[in-house]
C-alpha cells in the first residue's frame, strides 16, 4: 500500500473564487476526486490576491498528480491557469 501524502497546491483562477469554489464543491468534482482516492481537506483564497487559490488534498502517493494529468483539460475549462500551479507534498515519517 502506498503512503498517504498531503499535497498543497496554489494556482491562479480567471474567475471569482465563489464561481471556482462552486465547481470545486460540485458532485462532478467529488466524483473525479473519488476516482483517485483524493480527499480535499481545504480550499481557500488569498487575502492579498483574489485570483490566487490554495487547495490541500490528502491521497495515496502520486494520485493527485495522476488526477491533474487526467483532468487538466477539464480543470482548464473552469478557468484554472495551470501554468501558475505550484505544489508541495508532505508525509508523516515515523521515527
Model-derived features: positions:
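Surface-exposed beta-strand edges and their flanking turn/coil or helix-capping segments
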Residues: 21-24, 35, 55-57, 68-70, ...
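Short amphipathic alpha-helical segments
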Residues: 15-41, 72-76
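Glycine-rich beta-strand-turn "strand-cap" elements at beta-sheet edges
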Residues: 1-3, 36-52, 75-95
Amino acid at each position: 500500500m502506498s503512503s498517504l501524502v498531503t499535497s498543497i497546491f496554489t494556482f491562479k483562477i480567471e474567475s471569482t473564487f465563489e464561481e471556482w469554489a462552486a465547481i470545486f464543491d460540485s458532485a462532478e468534482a467529488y466524483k473525479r476526486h473519488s476516482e483517485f482516492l483524493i480527499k480535499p481537506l481545504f480550499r481557500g483564497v488569498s487575502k492579498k490576491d483574489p485570483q490566487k487559490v490554495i487547495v490541500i488534498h490528502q491521497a495515496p502517493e502520486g494520485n493527485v498528480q495522476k488526477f491533474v494529468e487526467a483532468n487538466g483539460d477539464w480543470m482548464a475549462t473552469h478557468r484554472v491557469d495551470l501554468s501558475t500551479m505550484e505544489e508541495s507534498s508532505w508525509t508523516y515519517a515515523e521515527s
